[in-house]
């Protein structure tokens, strides 16, 4: 009897890469279709939402309230919030939408979750880059002070989005009503994520508690990279990284546990 070929770690990674790539294409076609602009909605949708927020703050003349560029302030907070919120929201339905695919030997529950979250992260990232580049060109905002620091903050928050998505998906799998209310909960969390404020402007007795929220550190770090020394920020990259690792390890462990009861044997 011919012995089955055992794949190496590198071969397994290549297989998983192809599987996730195929799931990504399936998700894009299923969600956006093949007609009209199709997959371009991947980043057009978050771009338009961000643009609406920017224009609203711009034309309501919120720049008269502060000397800070209010367009840049909005742009350095809202898209990042959309990334972790959308990634966690869409992670919830990833298993039910791809149940039939789990009968394929190389498709795992984790792959379906990763594919959806990567799609949301990619869309938010492209939207952030495109709209920031466009607004710099037309002179609405200045060139960022430290692009590398902004990139590091974005990567840390993308990592946070993945960890949060895994945990939320796991909780929703075990407690279905939670999946229905998470969208509302995440919406309520928007004001707490640092999108609409600098920690420095809060009362000192509140700052300690606000800095316990990992999303606040990501937003502060991203804005520190953009505005440079013109603003005072209180980010701690190591704290975000620690929170990310905890979420990732917890999420991976729980997903691995319930996957055994979902994937066909």
From Swiss-Prot:
Its main location: membrane. Keywords: Capsule biogenesis/degradation, Cell inner membrane, Cell membrane, Membrane, Polysaccharide transport, Sugar transport, Transmembrane, Transmembrane helix, Transport. May form an ATP-driven capsule polysaccharide export apparatus, in association with the CtrB and CtrD proteins. This is Capsule polysaccharide export inner-membrane protein CtrC. Residues 37-258 form the ABC transmembrane type-2 domain. PANTHER family: CAPSULE POLYSACCHARIDE EXPORT INNER-MEMBRANE PROTEIN CTRC, INNER MEMBRANE TRANSPORT PERMEASE. Disulfide bonds: none annotated. It is found in: Cell inner membrane. PROSITE patterns: ABC_TM2. GO terms for cellular component: ATP-binding cassette (ABC) transporter complex. Pfam families: ABC2_membrane. One of its GO terms (biological process) is lipopolysaccharide transport. GO terms for molecular function: ABC-type transporter activity. It comes from the Bacteria. The chain crosses the membrane at residues 37-57, 64-84, 121-141, 147-167, 178-198, 236-256. InterPro entries: ABC2_TM, ABC2_TM_bact-type, ABC_2_transport. The keyword Hydrolase does not apply. It is a multi-pass membrane protein. Belongs to the ABC-2 integral membrane protein family.
């Amino acid at each position: 009897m011919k012995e089955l070929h055992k794949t190496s770690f590198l071969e397994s990674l290549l297989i998983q890469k192809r599987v996730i790539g195929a799931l990504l294409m399936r998700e894009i076609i299923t969600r956006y279709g093949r007609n009209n602009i199709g997959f371009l909605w991947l980043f057009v949708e978050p771009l338009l939402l961000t643009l609406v927020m920017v224009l609203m703050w711009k034309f309501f003349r919120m720049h008269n309230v502060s000397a800070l560029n209010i367009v840049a302030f909005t742009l350095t907070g809202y898209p990042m919030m959309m990334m972790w919120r959308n990634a966690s929201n869409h992670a919830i339905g990833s298993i039910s939408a791809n149940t039939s695919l789990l009968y394929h030997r190389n498709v795992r529950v984790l792959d379906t979750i990763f594919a959806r979250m990567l799609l949301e992260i990619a869309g938010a990232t492209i939207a952030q880059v495109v709209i920031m580049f466009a607004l710099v060109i037309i002179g609405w905002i200045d060139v960022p002070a430290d692009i590398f620091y902004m990139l590091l903050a974005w990567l840390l928050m993308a990592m946070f989005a993945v960890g949060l998505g895994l945990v939320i998906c796991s909780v929703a799998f075990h407690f279905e009503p939670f999946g229905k209310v998470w969208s509302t909960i995440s919406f309520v969390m928007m004001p707490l994520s640092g999108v609409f404020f600098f920690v420095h402007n809060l009362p000192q007795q509140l700052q300690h508690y606000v800095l316990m929220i990992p999303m606040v550190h990501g937003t502060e770090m991203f804005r520190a990279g953009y505005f440079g020394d013109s603003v005072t920020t209180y980010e701690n990259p190591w704290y975000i990284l620690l929170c990310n690792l905890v979420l990732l390890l917890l999420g991976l462990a729980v997903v691995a546990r319930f996957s055994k009861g979902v994937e066909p044997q």
